[in-house]
Amino acid sequence: MTAENPPTTESSVMPVAAIAGIIATVAVFAISQGLSYPLLSFILQRQGLSPAMIGVSAAMTPLGFIVSSFFIPALSRQFGAARLALACAALAALLLAAIATRQDIWTWFPLRFLLGFAANPLYVISETWMIAMAPPAKRGRLMGIYASIVSAGFAIGPLTLALVGTEGWPPFLVGISAFVLCGAILLAVLPRMPEMQDEKQPTSVAGFVLVAPLLLFAVFTAAAFEQGLLALFSVYGAAHGSSEQRISALLTVFIAGNVALQIPLGALAERVGATRVMLLCALFAAVGCALLPVLLPTLLIWPVAFVWGAVAFGIYTMGLIQLGENFSGSMLMTGNAAFALAWGTGGIAGPPLTGTVMDLIGVQGLPLALALLCGALAVGVFVSLVSQRRPAR
């Protein structure tokens, strides 16, 4: 799926402490990020803001993710990945404190944008370190563990609001403390982190799009699928007579499958290859879309939703594995930044595109749009596999 030789690995010894530290860092960071989205929405809702304004405010953070993606490779080369990651953790804590101090939507627009801008480099750098340190023989399972724990962190974030509430400083202090803890863990593990090589041959994020377009389309597909489904499944379910409680429970099962099955998918990738597993994930996701209208009223929808969530996000996990198989050094960093760009773009584009199809043909536009997206990816991956097997002339 890409056009660069795989990096060579000098040792198969796994730096367990360093990998555990990076996973813990990103998990804590994800909890704080997952807490901030619903917390700020609750506050704006109490202030009487319209759903449209609340949505625009929430979009500032992913917009910050997208914009920062173009700067991460250069900033990493200029200041070093370690310094950049530490600065981002500290800046995120300060920005969340500023958001807590000035609870005004107009002030929050730039602050939430900057929060996304600061958060994205930490994810990109952490994923780059994670991929670089993972021995090839264990990369599938390790990236599965990483993906599962990050997803769990985002899921745990909103649950903390049930414990500390959504008013006053307590929820903000939880988020700020998480960002500070993230920086402390980073400080502890930084001496064990690998250095990025190939720094004399920088590649831009835009240039990486030409190097690995199918990989980036896979990331776009995973993000558009997830965000489109989460945003519009309530509309689809209500049109089919499902209660709000049942719809919420099905979405919870969808997310649970995402969290639970990334490790088995990673293990399968080690046996048969990440590209083949990505093809299976895309096909199963498309089949799930086709079965949705039939299975939604039945009990079979529950196990299907569980597997559906796993394979939908599994597309992204397989993309990370392939990124590590084909790139190293500064190209790996640039590739991860391009992944962040593709994820942010897919996450923003997915709901309106899917919603437009629903407006045109009715509620069945949701599974149709998502199935077409996954089907297009499956065709691209299949063509890539066939071309790889074709003998060179």
What do these predicted regions represent?
Residues 13-62, 227-236, 247:
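Helix-loop boundary and gating motifs at the non-cytosolic
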Residues 68-80, 165, 261-273, 358-359:
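Helix-to-loop junctions at the C-terminal end of transmembrane segments
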Residues 83-97, 276-290, 371:
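Structural signature of the two symmetry-related core transmembrane helices
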Residues 113-149:
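Cytoplasmic helix-loop-helix junction between adjacent transmembrane helices
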Residues 121-134, 313-327:
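Intracellular juxtamembrane helix-capping segments at the cytosolic ends
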Residues 172-188, 367-382:
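Symmetry-related core transmembrane helices of the 12-TM Major Facilitator Superfamily/SLC fold
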Residues 275-317:
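C-terminal transmembrane helical hairpin of 12-TM major facilitator-type secondary transporters
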Residues 330-359:
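A late C-terminal transmembrane helix in Major Facilitator Superfamily
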